[in-house]
Amino acid sequence: MNKNATLMSHLQNAAIAVLTVTAVLLLIQTPLVGDLAGKTPYELAQDWLAGDTSTDTAVTTDLTELALPVRVVFTNEYARYGLSAITTLDTDFELAGTFFGEALGSATTYEACSGEKLLTALHASSIYLDLEAPTPLEVLSRILGVNDAPESSLLRVTRLVLCPAENGATLYLQDANQGFFVSRTAISSATLREALASLDGNGTDFAFALSGEFSQLSPYTLIFSEPPQRYTLSASNALTDQATFLRLAEFNPHTESGYTDSSGSTIIKEVYGTLRLEPDGSVFYQGADEAEAGSIYYVSAASIGKPTMLEAVAGAQRLAFTLLRDVSGDAELYLSEIDSSNKRFTVSFDYAVGGTPLRFSDGSHAATVTIEDQTITEFSLHCRSYTLSDSPALLLPIRQAAAIADSKYLSAELHVCYDEHGADTVGVGWFAD
């Protein structure tokens, strides 16, 4: 009898277990109603695990991580040594970066001067720094690691010259809108002369020192007897993993609020914004007027509702780096433009590959971010991935490029950029500014 009772007990327990498992299976396959209609608990759990956008996936950024393309010329008593196809992140820039960082950190009052004074300084011992994009002086200081530089109204600095003088080195700079300026610095002239004297020439010169077709160019155009070898790029759409992109952009990757239009673009509308993902990797966003702290769309500011220019650039950089940096291949991002009016900032970034800037044929940017108050309300992206190939890029010789520029432009400043037309390969060309 005891054996029968024990057997019955085991059978009852087994039956209860089977019924429990069956109930759970039925539950997870049962669609819910209301706002969760069409989703089973199991599917919701999957969505939560794979698509939780509450986790902070944004990268931590610093302005020193922006790879600003530059051209540098060291001039001593005997020769010039030039560098091109480098950025502020490259080791080849360290010497110039150290001197200009110290100069900007110790510069006193900037006084207006003539352009001839800056040009004259280039004839003697000096370091010349040419920026690919007009850059606010305050931002340039941060890029060079100077954290305590004073605020400045110079917003479009294009070139700088540092030269020895009697009482410390003198810094000249040009602002594209406001003209030329000069300032004393705390840099030892003896230290600067010693660094310059240690360098040998490499056949670099300025157009102002040359004759013939070069004399009609901008005097600041750099002529390299042996220009750096550049290579063609393989280019592709980097928006291949939409789920990951949506999660980084704080959208639900499993949302049912999206649709595909006749052009093949995916449009996703959520409460806080709308994303448009185009087949070629272009992305457009329009969002709410206010973002929550911690969101990728929130711009931190010391003064509520009034981010400074540096804070706006930092917020835009955080978004651009989060969405683009890990998928852009060999390309790096640099700040290429910033505009402001009232409480609105528009910050743009572009790609550089191997130290050479890349330009889109339609004049657009790799990323453009609009900030109002403390919220990113719009952005546009080119999600493109670039890989340096082993094939040398074909480039017209500088003399021929100069002859063509002379016939079309007045005092053109020539430099080399990658020319992006949306194809799967990208070459280089001469651009006149």
Identify the meaning behind each predicted range.
Residues 287-339, 371-409:
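Long, charged/polar, surface-exposed segments that mediate recognition or autoinhibition
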Residues 1-11:
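Short, Lys/Arg-rich N-terminal segment immediately upstream of the first membrane anchor
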Residues 242-288, 327-375, 381-382, 412-433:
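Exposed beta-strand-loop-beta-strand "reactive/processing" segments of non-cytosolic proteins
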Residues 13-16:
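Alpha-helical transmembrane spans
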Residues 102-106, 146-149, 321-326, 342-345:
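Short linear motifs at secondary-structure transitions and domain/linker junctions
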Residues 148, 152-182, 193-196, 202, ...:
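Zymogen propeptides/activation segments of proteases
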